[in-house]
Design a protein with these regions (language model features):
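Membrane-water interface at the C-terminal end of transmembrane alpha helices
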Residues: 110-134, 143
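Hydrophobic core of alpha-helical transmembrane segments in multi-pass integral membrane proteins
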Residues: 18-29, 107-121
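Juxtamembrane membrane-water interface segments of multi-pass membrane proteins
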Residues: 1-7, 31, 35, 60-74, ...
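Central hydrophobic cores of alpha-helical transmembrane segments
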Residues: 74-80, 131-135
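Membrane-helix boundary elements
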Residues: 6-44
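Non-cytosolic membrane-interface motifs at loop->transmembrane helix junctions
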Residues: 37-45, 75, 97-108
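Core segments of alpha-helical transmembrane spans in multipass integral membrane proteins
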Residues: 18-27, 43-65, 76-86
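Membrane-helix boundary connector in multi-pass membrane proteins
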Residues: 86-104, 121-122
């Protein structure tokens, strides 16, 4: 896959993930509370959760303009989604009243997280925008 095709896939993943975080989570919490809203219902918690993910979604949409220069944000979104999904998976397994989440928000976050990390990882160089020369590391010299 050439760089242009890869960047097109990255942009697509960022746009879809951003839109899911902005609109999908709030919508699914209303339409399918058993899979996306934890009990007991706490509107304050839900509003904070929706606000944080909507904000992340907006920044993922902005990152789609130039994925290479937003690598840290994309990796944060990916890894934090994986960690969040894993923690919720453990909680859902331990609490029988929350097991529906194992087919709801848990796999949704894990899938989005893995895909975000995958489209960001494979051996691509990190773009350095600083004009300040980096100090030489003697440990990395090859003689």
């Amino acid at each position: 896959m050439n760089e242009e095709t890869r960047e097109r896939y990255q942009r697509g993943v960022l746009i879809v993930s951003g839109l899911v975080f902005i609109f999908g989570i709030a919508l699914l919490m209303r339409l399918w509370p058993a899979g996306f809203a934890w009990t007991p219902r706490q509107p304050e918690y839900e509003q904070m959760f929706i606000g944080v993910y909507a904000t992340l979604g907006i920044f993922l949409l902005l990152a789609a303009r130039a994925p290479a220069t937003n690598r840290s944000l994309i990796l944060f979104a990916g890894w934090s989604s994986i960690v969040h999904g894993a923690i919720m998976a453990v909680q859902a397994v331990r609490d029988p009243t929350e097991q529906t989440h194992l087919v709801g928000d848990v796999p949704a976050l894990l899938i989005i997280g893995v895909v975000l990390v995958m489209v960001t990882q494979p051996g691509r160089q990190f773009v350095v925008t600083s004009r300040v020369p980096l100090p030489e590391n003697p440990a990395l010299r090859t003689h």
